[in-house]
Amino acid sequence: MSAFVVSDLVNVRYLTGFTGSNAAVLIDVSDPAGDRIATDGRYLTQVAAQVPDVEPVIERACVPALVAHARTAGVTRIGFEADAETVAGHRVLTASIEDSGVELVGLTGVVQGLRAVKDAGEIALLRAACAIGDAALARIIADGVLRAGTTERQAARALEFEMYRLGADGIAFETIVAAGAHSAIPHHRPTHTALADGDLVKIDFGAVVGGYHSDMTRTFVLRRAADWQRDIYDLVAAAQAAGRSALRPGAELREVDAAARDVIDDAGHGDHYVHGLGHGVGLEIHEAPGIGKLAAGTLPCGAAVTVEPGVYLPGWGGVRIEDTLVVTQGDPELLTTTDKTFTVI
């Protein structure tokens, strides 16, 4: 195989810096001078500015256009991103090479594997995004946003506004503010429900800087805490600390998950921990490597990952504590620094 077509837009951005909404890249394995980037006419000026060293192919149907270009150059075996191709798109692509002698080879996870290890520039952007998240949360707490009577949605929008005010390019995902019994829903969407004294308030959010995402969850109690809330919080905090300590280059992903999961299982709450320990973060909020009990593979040095165990008690409430960290040869670098001590606001 002497050519590879990349069509996943996040992978295109990673390889070229191009941020348009329609694009694909042809990588000439034997000669970089043969590389091409395809996009449509809307992005003629943008592609010239963002990818000045790669010759553009201006066609709306990007992948077929690049395959046709490779055929013209004499390539007979072309790789493509099978996990980025739709069934309909693949039918069009295969029809375009019928009886041509060209063989298409579906590949998965090639660029995602590269993205799993961050370089210094990527880590700097992640640090900046995490710092904005930390500062924004501190600001809304100082301003008294998290108080009885504020709705989940109002608190979420206030936090998002603060991230933008502090320089974020965007929010990493729709902010989760989950109060009371809603905090037992891992991915609750904020409603007009008002926060109340005695509520657990779970906040999961992130900022985007230069395309790179932060991810952090903190859980608080409003005004007065019950013993069961403190007990669940302390359990999740212990599991999270165990998970962070297991972040070492070469560690089996499922063993990292087990380090935290065993703490919760041993306390009798295994059935209330309903997701994996974490995931990679970068140009996407969820990317390789995934850390879960069924995960295969090992943790690479330079990976940016979350550690986010949780215990969720339906009808009562839940606690999740999440940090973003970078795996290093020594202790992992903690990028999200908001205090994790049990806090009553």
Give the location of each predicted region.
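Active-site neighborhoods and metal-handling regions in enzymes and metal-associated proteins
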Residues: 1-345
